[in-house]
Every structure is written in C-alpha cells, then in structure tokens.
C-alpha cells in the first residue's frame, strides 16, 4: 500500500479528498502545442504567423492549430492565473493539469499558480503522443519507463521535488505505435505499484479506447481508476458508447466549450455541441453510469481563454451546469460528476 493511500496529491502536497471541491479533471494551464501545428492553405499562409486580433479571431477559432501564437498557452500565465480565480469565484476547487512530457510541462509554474490562487492543482506524470517522444524515450524499456513514472509521483518531476498526482494524460495515436504501447504497459505497472489515478488520451478512432483498455488490462492496470478522455470526439454511436462504458473506466467529456464548424484533426467528424454533450451525459446517467462520468474543457490553445473571447475555465460551472439542470439531470447527479467522481478517481488506493 502506498504512503499516499487515501489521499490526493497536489503540487503543494497531499490533501484529504474532501478538500477537492468541484473539480475539472482535464485542463492545461501551461503548455505548448507546436507538435500539432497544421499549416494553413497557401492563400491563408500569412495568418499562421499573425497575432490574434479581432479581425482574424473567427479564423483562429475555426483553425486553432494553424496559428502559431495560438499554440503557445504558456505565454498567458498572468491571464490564466486570473481565470483560475474566476473559476474559484464560480465555486471551483480543483484542477487536474494533464500536461505531460512532450508538450512543455512546467510543474514549477503550476506550484506558483496553486500558491497564488488557493485552487488545488494536480499535475500529470508521463508522456504525450509518439510524435513528441524523444529518441531516449523511444529507446527505454517498459521497466525504465515505469521507473520514470513512479519517480515523478514519489520523488518529483522535471528535476524538482514537486510531485505529480496522476499518471496522464498518456498520449495515444491511431494506430497505436510501439513506443506508445510500451508507455501504456509502463503506466499499468506504475499504477499497480502506486494505486494512483490514470488519464488516457485515445487516438481519433472509435476503436481506440477499446484497444487501449485491452492493453492496460493485459498489463495489470486498474481500469476502475482510469479515465478515458475525449470521448466527445471519439465515440459518437450511442450503442458503441454504452458498450465501452461496460469496460469500467471513467468516461470523460472534456471538450465543453469547443463548438466549431471545422475540426482540423479529423475533417470527417462533426464536433458535437455542448447541447450534444449534455445529451450524451443524460444517456449515460439513464443507463446507470452516473458514477463514472467526469467533465472538463481541455483548454490547450489561447483562443479558448476569456482574454481572447473564449469560454475560459469557468464555463462548465457558469453555463453548463444550469443547462444540465434544465435538461433533466438532477442536482444529485451534477454533484456526483463534479464532486464525488473526481474525488473517487483522484484518491490513491
């Protein structure tokens, strides 16, 4: 049994689970996303290097990965700190920060934000998708990768003594690469040693979450303490969603606020609206899965910040919760999704 058993580990140290309050389970507060830059069409090429202005804001919102400045969330620390305070004023208590190795995790900055705002911040250990893996990461064995993950939780990350409180988001592509498979196997082994929560970023294919769960199970993971992220852009068929729900992971709808005509990473996909997301939550609740749902915004680009006319970290509390209540989701279920389920997930076994 880990010394962290029964506790939640924040960047400021362990806390009692009851101290979490309303929790966003998948956000980014300081990161860069240059790994996923998408060059714009030739006739719009100058927009890639343009500053974000009112006159190009619609274009940036529809093509968020084609504007280089938009991918540098770590430039907006002051604005993000202010927005965390707005989240707190709206009734928020904790944020799980899922930035891992490969997309510029800054755990020192997360500690500073937690100290300045009084909001609990839980940092993620691990590695993002294969495209961000270094040659040294790719050359590691499962045992070596496991040691890295365990050390980031027990000793500290990035050369500091600031410790991660989850493993994840662990990045997976579609199809899964060999390096990503090793990281998944290491994640399962580290989780079995630590009893810690895990968060997975699946590839953009409806079969990806199933494949990932199979690999984790075979490697000894605790699926009941594992979150499958981004289901709102991954599984659209209701029957398939309910089939996946039976596997026992937490079901994360974490793109609230993302309503766009153009989903750059998969042009064949219609990104659901927030109203569509609420419908899927209601379906899962009606089928008995209210204990397995968690929600968030996954803010990872500047355009989604309040500073740039976006929804910010308070969107779920200010705008989505009232709509959930109007649309047939009880206050008891809302509290489970925002309070109880994150608490159960984040508490070390």
From Swiss-Prot:
Say where the protein is mainly found. cytoplasm
Protein encoded by which gene: pter
Query: Where in the sequence is the signal peptide annotated?
Result: none
Q: Does the keyword Cytoplasm apply?
A: yes
What are the GO MF terms of this UniProt record? N-acetyltaurine hydrolase activity; zinc ion binding
Task: Identify the CDD domains for this entry.
Answer: PTE
Q: Does the keyword Cytoplasm apply?
A: yes
EC number(s) reported in the record: 3.1.-.-
GO biological process assignments = catabolic process; regulation of appetite; taurine metabolic process
Q: What does this protein do?
A: N-acetyltaurine hydrolase that catalyzes the hydrolysis of N-acetyltaurine into taurine and acetate. PTER also acts on other N-acetyl amino acids (Met, Ile, Leu, Val) and N-propionyltaurine, but at lower rates.
Q: Where does a divalent metal cation 2 bind?
A: 169, 201, 230
Q: Which residues bind a divalent metal cation 1?
A: 26, 28, 169, 298
Q: What's this protein's family per the entry?
A: Belongs to the metallo-dependent hydrolases superfamily. Phosphotriesterase family.
Its localization reads:
Cytoplasm, Cytosol
User: InterPro entries this protein is in?
Assistant: AryldialkylPase_Zn-BS, Metal_Hydrolase, Phosphotriesterase
Question: What cystine pairs are annotated?
Answer: none
According to UniProt, the reaction catalysed is: N-acetyltaurine + H2O = taurine + acetate; N-propanoyltaurine + H2O = propanoate + taurine; N-acetyl-L-methionine + H2O = L-methionine + acetate; N-acetyl-L-isoleucine + H2O = L-isoleucine + acetate
Q: Name one GO cellular component term.
A: cytosol
Keywords of the record, alphabetical order, are:
Cytoplasm, Hydrolase, Metal-binding
What is one Pfam family matched by this protein?
Answer: PTE
The protein's name is N-acetyltaurine hydrolase
